[in-house]
From Swiss-Prot:
This is Methionyl-tRNA formyltransferase. Gene3D superfamilies: 3.40.50.12230. (6S)-5,6,7,8-tetrahydrofolate binds at residues 110-113. Pfam families: Formyl_trans_C, Formyl_trans_N. Keywords: Protein biosynthesis, Transferase.
Length: 328
């Protein structure tokens, strides 16, 4: 099949790569325009655009796609069989959805209709979901409201964070999308619609994964310890707090259970009721901080202008004192 691939971040590359290596022909890639992201106002290409350039594939980076007559006519002229969309970043209008022969399909990283929207992986971790997955969806004009052709569910591991879970789902999306393309090609002249599953028939709650905002990254020590842990995983590696006026990225923590607190090595912890207080500094354990509920151990962090540090090294770097306060 002749395919146009739509994608922008690194997450999308596994799917683009698997189709380039398949029997199908990727005749073009659509990605977001270059953006100014570094000092000196230098324009930076999206990861997908950079990858497509290495593969010598024609690239389109329209500033707008809705009512863009020139771009739409260009797409129509390519006689494309299938549009594959994975983390492109914009909702495609009806006039584009209707162009390809086999339709326009999206791989969404959640168990729809849970976590429709821009940041499903982040919110599945932040909210402590036990499972997630990938759904291959026939796109319509709504926000991730299309019918599903395929879906695969995976367990979210206790040690998963945004990086590790994104990698798993990126690989799963690629494999599932390739399988979906074969199904569409084989059954196109049969009743493809009969193979689709409507989201409202799955009995799942509809939730929305809004875009992550700058304010979301700040750790609120007044929350429950488990919620703080989930947030750090879901926003890895950008969750942060303020220590002595400097930004401190919190990369990994451990929640101390009630039983663990009874261990003799923690008995000398200062008793502070205020969240965000350093309760103890234990060389072989880490920095212990109070929350609304259980204390947490700061295992890995990155102080502004410094390298990532853990446990003993982090203690030597920060030189924290019992009773100091981490601000939110």
């Amino acid at each position: 099949m002749r395919i146009i691939f739509w994608g922008t971040p690194e997450y999308s590359i596994a799917s683009l790569d698997i189709f380039i290596k398949s029997k199908h022909e990727v005749i073009g890639v659509v990605s977001q325009p270059d953006k100014k992201r570094s000092r000196g106002n230098k324009l930076i290409s999206s990861p997908v655009k950079s990858f497509a350039e290495q593969e010598s594939i024609k690239i389109y980076t329209p500033v707008k796609i809705r009512d863009n007559i020139h771009f739409i006519n260009e797409l129509k002229s390519l006689s494309c069989d299938l549009f594959i969309v994975i983390a492109y970043g914009k909702i495609l209008p009806k006039e584009i959805l209707e162009i390809p022969k086999f339709g326009c399909w999206n791989a969404h990283a959640s168990l729809l209709p849970r976590w429709r929207g821009a940041a499903p992986i982040q919110w599945s971790l932040i909210k402590g979901d036990k499972f997630t997955g990938v759904g291959i969806m026939k796109m319509n004009e709504g926000l991730d409201t299309g019918d599903l052709l395929l879906e695969e569910k995976i367990k979210i591991g206790n040690e998963d964070n945004l990086n590790t879970l994104s990698e798993k789902l990126s690989i799963l999306s690629a494999k599932l999308f390739l399988k979906a393309a074969s199904l569409l090609e084989e059954n196109f002249y049969k009743n493809t619609k009969s193979q689709l599953t409507k989201q409202n028939s799955l009995g799942r709650e509809i939730t929305y994964a809004r875009m992550i905002e700058k304010s979301d990254f700040r750790v609120d020590w007044g929350n429950q310890a488990i919620a703080i842990s989930q947030k750090i995983k879901g926003l890895y590696p950008r969750a942060n707090t303020i220590f002595r006026g400097k930004n401190l990225k919190i990369l990994k923590i451990k929640v101390l259970s009630s039983d663990e607190i009874k261990n003799e090595k923690y008995l000398f912890m200062s008793d502070y009721s205020r969240p965000g207080i350093i309760l103890a500094v234990i060389e072989d354990e880490g920095i212990i901080i109070s929350t609304k509920t259980d204390p947490i151990i700061l295992l890995e962090a990155k102080l502004e202008g410094k390298n990532i540090s853990s446990k003993k090294q982090l203690i030597q770097q920060l030189k924290p004192s019992v009773g100091e306060y981490l601000s939110d």
